[in-house]
């Protein structure tokens, strides 16, 4: 696994964070050291797939990056005639994802598309995964995307939505942000790396509160919604049609 050193040296003109070649190369290391509970979420996505995925249906991994969630789901699918569709708008991610998927043998076909997830038609879905993806979608487009997902899910189909959260209570928000930064420092990131990455993400990652996510999901049509995992200001929700 290649080590993430992207923000280790001072960057004079710090642009917006992008999922480019450099990020794609070190992404597994970056996300493990940056997102508390990431491995638990990936493992649980497979467990959810065991429960949600039905025969003759599709599974969508929207914002699939290098395929960790796709592979976790595929390992746990036992139903016949299931196909997984992974989508990411970063070509370097898609190329590595295809290599990663092809390195493992399985009877379950996987198609990885390089596209904007907002362009994808969701249909005959028994499960949809949004694993730390919605926070990078423009806020004005999030409701419509969730509505498309709800419409494309079969009855009893499930959506797993993992996100970084913000909290309305400023004192609590500041505390959880500080604890997250402490988590990153404990994983070997310097103060410079933490601050430069935070600045680079400011304009591209817009976080919402848990309440906002629940309201959006309700408005999309979901009635069964639960936060099933949280560690500091990161967590994952499940919604069932």
UniProtKB/Swiss-Prot annotation:
Keyword S-adenosyl-L-methionine recorded: yes
Record's keyword terms, sorted: S-adenosyl-L-methionine, Transferase
Enzyme Commission code: 2.1.3.-
Record's catalysed reaction(s): prephenate + S-adenosyl-L-methionine = carboxy-S-adenosyl-L-methionine + 3-phenylpyruvate + H2O
InterPro entries recorded: CmoA, Methyltransf_25, SAM-dependent_MTases_sf
Lineage top rank: taxon: Bacteria
Coiled-coil residue windows: none
Pfam families: Methyltransf_25
GO molecular function, one term: S-adenosyl-L-methionine binding
Family membership noted in the UniProt record: Belongs to the class I-like SAM-binding methyltransferase superfamily. Cx-SAM synthase family.
Protein name as annotated: Carboxy-S-adenosyl-L-methionine synthase
Organism from which the protein derives: Histophilus somni (strain 2336) (Haemophilus somnus)
């Amino acid at each position: 696994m290649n080590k993430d050193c992207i923000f280790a040296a001072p960057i004079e003109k710090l642009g917006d964070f992008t999922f480019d070649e450099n990020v794609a190369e070190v992404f597994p290391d970056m996300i493990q050291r940056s997102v508390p509970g990431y491995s638990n979420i990936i493992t649980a996505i497979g467990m959810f797939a065991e429960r949600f995925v039905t025969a003759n249906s599709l599974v969508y991994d929207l914002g699939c990056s290098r395929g960790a969630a796709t592979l976790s789901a595929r390992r746990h699918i036992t139903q016949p005639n299931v196909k997984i569709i992974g989508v990411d708008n970063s070509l370097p991610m898609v190329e590595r994802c295809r290599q990663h998927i092809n390195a493992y043998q399985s009877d379950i076909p996987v198609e990885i598309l390089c596209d904007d997830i907002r362009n994808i038609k969701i249909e005959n879905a028994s499960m949809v995964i949004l694993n730390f993806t919605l926070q990078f979608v423009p806020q004005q487009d999030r409701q419509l995307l969730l509505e498309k997902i709800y419409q494309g899910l079969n009855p009893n189909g499930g959506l797993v939505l993992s996100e970084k959260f913000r909290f309305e209570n400023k004192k609590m928000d500041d505390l959880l942000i500080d604890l997250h930064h402490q988590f990153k420092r404990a994983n070997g990131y310097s103060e410079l790396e933490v601050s430069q990455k935070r600045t680079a993400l400011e304009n591209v990652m817009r976080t919402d509160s848990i309440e906002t996510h629940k309201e959006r999901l309700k408005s999309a049509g979901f009635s069964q919604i639960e936060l099933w995992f949280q560690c500091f200001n990161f967590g994952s929700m499940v919604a069932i049609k």
